[in-house]
């Protein structure tokens, strides 16, 4: 489904023009890469916080600084994406429709509308979201929040028996995923100590999970496992798992496979339909730029979303069991209020309540930009710009060998095994000092205690010059931290 990058680039990354070019360490070289970047124009489609904004203690627009602001270095799209310029317009149009139409806004069309009437906004979100994750439109629903959606999906896909009751998950999964899996196992009266299989790194100095190790874990627990739930991209290390291979192998053992795509959607070129993934869920406030806590999304493969109307009211199951709500019901009968639930086919049949139209406007404002850019082009730039970041981190300054640097990169070096993010592990005792210098220079990244920072150039709004400036400041921060530590 959707567009794909050339196979060689997916496997090995693109040819990097700066590997043997000493000019790559100059700001002019970074600026030349920006001048050639086909996505460079999208930077102007986002609101970049200024250095002054980051220090302000008020939000009153009448107290804006008089002089021209200096943009910050925002490399934190893996945590919270920046606001598209168009978001304000989308929300203003929604507020106007609500103000002028009230309840009739659910059905009234407008000649200049940015979204359909309230009753159909979820369909608009699914239409734009599907190509981003490589899905059919019917396989995607924009709804809920990430952990809520994981529970909704596991309520349907995790149907444990005395023989098959385990869920396999990475040992350092994002805590909310861990809690969700643990509570699902408890909910079905199993003990998580036995029912929860945690995949840990084989080498604790290298916190990534080799595909072969994951495959062996699946084989070891195959006869007793019901579901495997992994992160498409691991939030801490930035590792991009081999979704296609892991999914196929687990399914060959009779295991249902789900993926948390929070750090993958809008970041890498997913093909959830073609990879035969059973189910997936993701948030939209990271690379998809919908705002804090924005409406999330889920994926249900078409084979699981079928509704057999001929079996309704028979002893056979006409559709997959699920937690049900009125917004997942057949649109033709939704407002009859007859309490006879027949779901819409596909992922839409897993919806519970009508979506927040306010939130959906913020989601769609960003998704329209992805439609213009395409995931293939976004991934292509991501491979280049994150490769450039890695090159500068490891090789600048020229007189410092990488083994003598006060940090290591724990994200896989193979571009096919990562997205935009690089996770950088500092030597003990340096993190707070480094963060202080970065903050003083209006560099926005995030940290994971005790010693890791995560840096993620977002292809739609970050530039090669951003990356060059970050590496310069980061080197300075490391030198100051080493002196402060003594």
Swiss-Prot record:
Transmembrane segments: none annotated. One of its GO terms (molecular function) is kynureninase activity. Keywords: Cytoplasm, Hydrolase, Pyridine nucleotide biosynthesis, Pyridoxal phosphate. Residues 53-72 are annotated as: Disordered. Pyridoxal 5'-phosphate binds at residues 146-147, 174-177, 231, 260, 263, 285, 326, 354. Its cofactor is pyridoxal 5'-phosphate. Pathway: Amino-acid degradation; L-kynurenine degradation; L-alanine and anthranilate from L-kynurenine: step 1/1; Cofactor biosynthesis; NAD(+) biosynthesis; quinolinate from L-kynurenine: step 2/3. It is found in: Cytoplasm. It catalyses: L-kynurenine + H2O = anthranilate + L-alanine + H(+); 3-hydroxy-L-kynurenine + H2O = 3-hydroxyanthranilate + L-alanine + H(+). The modification N6-(pyridoxal phosphate)lysine is found at residue 286. Its main location: cytoplasm. It comes from the Eukaryota. Belongs to the kynureninase family. Homodimer. This is Kynureninase 1. It comes from Aspergillus clavatus (strain ATCC 1007 / CBS 513.65 / DSM 816 / NCTC 3887 / NRRL 1 / QM 1276 / 107). The lineage of its organism: Eukaryota, Fungi, Dikarya, Ascomycota, Pezizomycotina. The gene is bna5-1.
């Amino acid at each position: 489904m959707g567009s794909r990058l050339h196979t060689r680039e997916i496997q090995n990354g693109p040819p990097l023009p700066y590997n043997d070019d000493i000019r790559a360490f100059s700001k002019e070289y970074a600026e030349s890469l920006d001048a050639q970047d086909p996505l460079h124009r999208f930077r102007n489609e986002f609101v970049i916080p200024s250095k002054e904004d980051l220090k302000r203690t008020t939000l009153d627009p009448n107290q804006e600084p008089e002089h021209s602001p200096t943009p910050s270095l925002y490399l934190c799209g893996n945590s919270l994406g920046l606001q598209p310029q168009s978001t304000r317009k989308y929300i203003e149009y929604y507020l106007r429709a609500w103000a002028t139409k009230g309840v009739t806004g659910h059905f009234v069309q407008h000649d200049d509308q940015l979204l359909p009437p309230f009753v159909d906004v979820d369909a608009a979100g699914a239409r734009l979201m599907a190509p981003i994750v490589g899905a059919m439109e019917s396989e995607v629903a924009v709804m809920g929040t990430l952990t809520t959606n994981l529970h909704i999906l596991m309520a349907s896909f995790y149907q444990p028996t005395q023989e098959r009751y385990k869920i396999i998950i990475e040992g350092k999964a994002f805590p909310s995923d861990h809690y969700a899996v643990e509570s699902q196992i408890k909910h079905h009266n199993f003990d998580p100590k036995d029912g929860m299989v945690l995949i840990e790194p084989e080498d604790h100095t290298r916190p990534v999970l080799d595909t072969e190790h994951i495959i062996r874990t699946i084989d070891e627990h195959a006869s007793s496992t019901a579901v495997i739930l992994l992160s498409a991209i691991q939030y801490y290390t930035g590792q991009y798992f081999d979704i296609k291979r892991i999914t196929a192998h687990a399914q060959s053992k009779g295991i249902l496979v789900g993926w948390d795509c929070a750090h993958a959607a809008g970041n890498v070129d997913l093909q959830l339909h073609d990879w035969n993934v059973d189910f997936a869920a993701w948030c939209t406030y990271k690379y998809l730029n919908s705002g804090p806590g924005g409406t999330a999304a889920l994926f249900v493969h078409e084979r699981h979303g079928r509704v057999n109307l001929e079996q309704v009211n028979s002893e056979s199951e006409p559709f997959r069991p699920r937690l049900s709500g009125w917004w997942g019901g057949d649109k033709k009968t939704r407002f009859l209020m007859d309490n006879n639930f027949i779901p819409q086919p596909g992922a839409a049949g897993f919806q519970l309540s009508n979506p927040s139209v306010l939130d959906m406007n913020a989601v769609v404002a960003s998704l329209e930009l992805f439609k213009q850019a395409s995931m293939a082009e976004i991934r292509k730039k991501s491979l280049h710009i994150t490769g450039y970041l890695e090159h500068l981190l490891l090789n600048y300054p020229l007189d410092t060998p990488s083994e003598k640097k006060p940090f290591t990169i724990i994200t896989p070096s193979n571009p096919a095994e990562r997205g935009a993010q690089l996770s950088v592990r500092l030597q003990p005792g340096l993190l707070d000092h480094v963060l202080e210098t970065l903050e003083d220079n209006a560099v926005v990244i995030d940290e994971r205690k005790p010693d890791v920072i995560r840096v993620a150039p977002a292809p739609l709004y970050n530039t090669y010059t951003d990356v060059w400036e970050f590496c310069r400041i980061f080197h300075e921060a490391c030198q100051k931290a080493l002196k402060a530590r003594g």
